[in-house]
Design a protein with these regions (language model features):
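Short alpha-helical transmembrane segments in multi-pass integral membrane proteins
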Residues: 1-23, 81-146, 188-245, 301-366, ...
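Transmembrane helical elements of multi-pass membrane transporters/channels
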Residues: 21-40, 142, 153, 176, ...
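N-terminal transmembrane alpha-helices
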Residues: 10-47, 61-76, 80, 105-112, ...
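Small-residue-rich hydrophobic transmembrane alpha-helices
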Residues: 41, 53-113, 150-169, 275-333, ...
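Short runs within selected transmembrane alpha-helices of multi-pass transporters and secretion channels
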Residues: 74, 143-161, 169-180, 198-213, ...
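Transmembrane alpha-helix boundary and packing residues in multipass membrane permease domains
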Residues: 26, 30, 42, 79, ...
Length: 459
């Protein structure tokens, strides 16, 4: 059965242009998703109080953990679909998509229930100040009501991207992003609903994005998704979880370590929390450029690895590293140069702007280092080695970072000393990931495809 790839053929021809075309919508999608939270922060800061801004802000790392776990789990669906595409197994795609959507809904409902139970304990864990605790808990509980729709969007988008369609998920998220801003202003500035209005706006916009991508899956001639269809892929759940769980753990461990950092930031009061929140919005937006290339590396590697095109897998690694470094460095330095002006978009409070500047100076200058472990990790996941990147992240970012907090930071408890941990631990993770790439050797040596042509070799 002939399989028509939606937007591009990842198995033949030039790679560089296709990687850029594929990556740009993913990066923009992630940025728009982060702008949901940035809009929440900006509206809370301008139409509420400093405490309202801090209540939303203290949830930033918890929500980043939730979003990262969802995205990580969806990578399993992406790899499963991409391997079927690489092997030209079009007949297996409808059942695989059906399995992915059922799994997303089941995990989403479980997450919704856990969110209602765990909201207060999580906020206690990170030492949320009492003056903002109730508002922060309310925001998190309402936010978690939309968790099933977040998972449905992520899994649906992962399925579409596996066939080369990264454009439609971006357009769906862009539309819901505009809706989020409008609803934020309506509920918070107009109806004065406070942090509850901010959270409800995010939930409704997430529902819209999920509806749009599910509609696309239903109309796709190959996927043929239908809610009442009972087809399922044999071993499909295990195939998704085998890659998805390590990827989710990798992201979760990274965010979990950041929650420990957030707990340390919380000791410095509401202004430090608000400043850190503003800086994190910029960090995530720029970091998503890197993770978009890592996602591209995973998808392209999955298809080519399944098709036996190992030489192209090596080319994918090199190109993604080079392009990601090139595309990410300029925004990092632009944010550093204009940090005060950009922070002023979120709040007029001079002390908060200064606090945001401290974090930006300590971290964003070094964030391009993340390319050197995220891209190889994406290639390893696409090659079927999802566990090692999770383990290296667990050691390099979680264990070392927590150790830093309880040793170096405890000896000198200042915000710069806390933030300096990040670039040092990124370097440690780079070393661990490089060792894994050398040891696992995911691309067989001398595995040039016998039918490779000059056209397919051309970058």
């Amino acid at each position: 059965m002939h399989l028509k790839i939606s937007d591009m053929d990842m198995l033949h021809g030039s790679l560089a242009g296709k990687l850029l075309l594929f990556t740009l919508p993913i990066a923009l999608s992630s940025m728009v998703q982060q702008l949901f939270n940035a809009a929440d922060t900006a509206v809370a800061g301008h139409f509420g109080s400093a405490n309202a801004l801090a209540a939303v802000g203290t949830n930033t790392e918890i929500i980043a953990l939730i979003v990262t776990v969802s995205s990580g789990l969806s990578i399993g669906a992406n790899v499963l679909i991409a391997k079927h595409v690489g092997r030209n197994e079009a007949e297996k795609l409808p059942a695989a998509v059906q399995t992915a959507m059922r799994l997303a809904m089941c995990i989403g409902v479980i997450g919704l229930l856990l969110g209602q139970i765990a909201a207060a304990p999580l906020l206690r864990l990170i030492r949320t100040p009492e003056e903002i605790f109730d508002a922060a808990a309310l925001y998190l509980r309402i936010y978690m009501l939309g968790y099933p729709f977040l998972l449905l969007y992520d899994f649906s988008a992962a399925c579409l991207r596996a066939r080369g369609d990264s454009r439609y998920p971006f357009l769906a998220l862009l539309l819901s992003g505009f809706a989020n801003v409008g609803l934020n202003l309506l509920f918070t500035a107009g109806l004065r609903m406070g942090v509850a209005g901010v959270a409800i706006a995010t939930d409704l916009s997430t529902m819209l994005s999920a509806f749009l991508v599910l509609r696309r899956l239903a109309k796709d001639a190959v996927f043929r998704f239908a809610i009442l269809n009972q087809r399922s892929a044999r071993n499909g759940v295990w195939s998704i979880l085998k890659t998805g769980i390590p990827s989710a753990v990798q992201g979760a461990v990274f965010c979990f370590a950041n929650i420990f950092v957030q707990a340390s930031v919380n000791r410095f009061g509401a202004e430090a929390i608000a400043g850190s929140t503003i800086a994190m919005n910029f960090e995530y937006v720029t970091y998503y450029i890197i993770t978009a290339f890592a996602q591209a590396a995973t998808t392209f590697t999955s298809q080519n690895h399944a098709a036996g095109e190992f030489w192209r897998c090596r080319r994918i690694l090199r190109l993604c590293l080079g392009l990601s470094l090139l595309c990410s460095t300029v925004p990092f330095f632009a944010i550093v140069l204009f940090r005060d002006t950009l922070s002023g978009l979120f709040t007029p409070n001079a002390a908060v702007i200064q606090s945001a500047g401290v974090r930006i100076l300590c971290m964003l200058l070094f964030e391009p280092l993340c390319n050197l472990y995220e891209i190889p990790a994406g290639v390893l996941r696409g090659s079927g080695y999802a566990l090692y990147p999770a383990l290296s992240t667990m050691v390099g970012t979680c264990a070392f970072r927590i150790a830093w907090i309880y040793t170096v930071f405890r000896a000198k408890p200042t915000l710069p000393m806390l933030y300096h941990a990040f670039p040092l631990l990124w370097a440690a993770t780079i070393v661990l990931t490089a060792l894994g790439l050398l040891a696992l050797r995911p691309f067989a040596p001398g595995s040039e495809h016998p039918h490779t042509t000059a056209q397919s070799r051309r970058v």
